[in-house]
């Protein structure tokens, strides 16, 4: 039985199904975002990988991630405000 089937055989609750899909999409988006940001910031900030990050590498990664999060927020707000 898949996660969209109900045990009683009746059709699934549409609202509950939509909530489940939204939650799965949000989780997938967050995972993809973190992977992308992590890879880009690591590539930008860590020029000589070693056994640990230097202070400047750690600061660079932190600033880079903060900028990505801020930029994503700006773009999201712009998209949502233009659709209204």
From Swiss-Prot:
Disulfide linkages recorded for this protein, renumbered to the chain, are 41-64, 45-60
Give the GO terms filed under biological process for this record: protein transport
Coordinates of motif Twin CX3C motif in the sequence?
A: 41-64
Q: Does the keyword Metal-binding apply?
A: yes
Q: What does this protein do?
A: Mitochondrial intermembrane chaperone that participates in the import and insertion of some multi-pass transmembrane proteins into the mitochondrial inner membrane. Also required for the transfer of beta-barrel precursors from the TOM complex to the sorting and assembly machinery (SAM complex) of the outer membrane. Acts as a chaperone-like protein that protects the hydrophobic precursors from aggregation and guide them through the mitochondrial intermembrane space.
**Protein family membership:** Belongs to the small Tim family.
Q: What is known of its domains?
A: The twin CX3C motif contains 4 conserved Cys residues that form 2 disulfide bonds in the mitochondrial intermembrane space. However, during the transit of TIM13 from cytoplasm into mitochondrion, the Cys residues probably coordinate zinc, thereby preventing folding and allowing its transfer across mitochondrial outer membrane.
Q: What is this protein called?
A: Mitochondrial import inner membrane translocase subunit Tim13
Give the source species: Oryza sativa subsp. japonica (Rice)
Lineage, uppermost ranks: Eukaryota, Viridiplantae, Streptophyta, Embryophyta, Tracheophyta
């Amino acid at each position: 039985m898949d996660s969209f089937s109900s045990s009683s055989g009746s059709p699934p609750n549409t609202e509950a199904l939509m909530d489940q899909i939204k939650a799965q999409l949000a989780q997938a988006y967050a995972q993809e975002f973190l992977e992308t940001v992590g890879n880009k910031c690591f590539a930008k900030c860590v020029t000589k990988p070693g056994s640990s990050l230097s202070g400047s590498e750690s600061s660079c990664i932190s600033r880079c991630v903060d900028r990505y999060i801020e930029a994503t927020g700006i773009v999201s707000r712009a998209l949502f405000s233009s659709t209204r």
